[in-house]
């Protein structure tokens, strides 16, 4: 037994096997991405910054049903509905999301019957003050207008599974 230990220490078997293992991984392509310059793949169900969508004619989709407000586990959504219009529909006068409270669970998006509130593809929305994370209706509509093409594509891809 002692002779075996002496042979291993003289031949540095562990060192050589570790060196070859390191060289094996050293020569493989890198698994990481250079983040600010390269963007990783985001799937169609990615939950990023919230957005309110519009119909192609420019009218907002939200019908003030308040399902998203009711289902939000963090109670981050506040909606106030205006009076009924001549055609019997309602629209929101106030639609606020407190992004500090939001846990990005996606339940608001799942509850919406008209796909008005969605969690878009944007995840880079750092701010300097907490007040900037209180999204009002105008900010949410701007997000929807900015990301509409990608949001519509992601919803179309995900449609068979909904």
UniProtKB/Swiss-Prot annotation:
Gene for this chain: nuoI
EC number(s) stated in the UniProt entry for this protein: 7.1.1.-
Quaternary data: NDH-1 is composed of 14 different subunits. Subunits NuoA, H, J, K, L, M, N constitute the membrane sector of the complex.
Cofactor(s) this protein cannot do without: [4Fe-4S] cluster
NCBIfam families assigned to the protein according to its UniProt record, in alphabetical order: NuoI (TIGR01971), PRK05888.1-4 (NF004538), PRK05888.1-5 (NF004539)
Family, as annotated: Belongs to the complex I 23 kDa subunit family.
Entry keyword set: 4Fe-4S, Cell inner membrane, Cell membrane, Iron, Iron-sulfur, Membrane, Metal-binding, NAD, Quinone, Repeat, Translocase, Ubiquinone
GO BP annotations listed: aerobic respiration
Bilayer topology term: Peripheral membrane protein
Function: NDH-1 shuttles electrons from NADH, via FMN and iron-sulfur (Fe-S) centers, to quinones in the respiratory chain. The immediate electron acceptor for the enzyme in this species is believed to be ubiquinone. Couples the redox reaction to proton translocation (for every two electrons transferred, four hydrogen ions are translocated across the cytoplasmic membrane), and thus conserves the redox energy in a proton gradient.
GO CC list: plasma membrane
Protein name: NADH-quinone oxidoreductase subunit I
């Amino acid at each position: 037994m002692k002779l075996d230990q002496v042979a291993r220490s003289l031949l540095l078997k562990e060192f050589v096997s570790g060196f070859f293992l390191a060289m094996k991984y050293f020569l493989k392509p890198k698994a990481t991405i250079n983040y600010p310059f390269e963007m990783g793949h985001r799937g169609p169900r990615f939950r990023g910054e919230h957005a309110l969508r519009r119909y192609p004619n420019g009218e907002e989709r939200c019908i003030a049903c308040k399902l998203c407000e009711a289902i939000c586990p963090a109670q981050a959504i506040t909606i106030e509905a205006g009076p009924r219009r001549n055609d019997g529909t309602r629209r929101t006068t106030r639609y606020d999301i407190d992004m500090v409270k939001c846990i990005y669970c996606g339940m608001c998006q799942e509850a919406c019957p008209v796909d008005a509130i969605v969690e878009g593809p944007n995840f880079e929305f750092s701010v300097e003050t907490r007040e900037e994370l209180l999204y009002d209706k105008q900010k949410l509509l701007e997000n929807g207008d900015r990301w509409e093409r990608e949001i519509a594509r992601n919803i179309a891809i995900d449609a068979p599974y909904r």
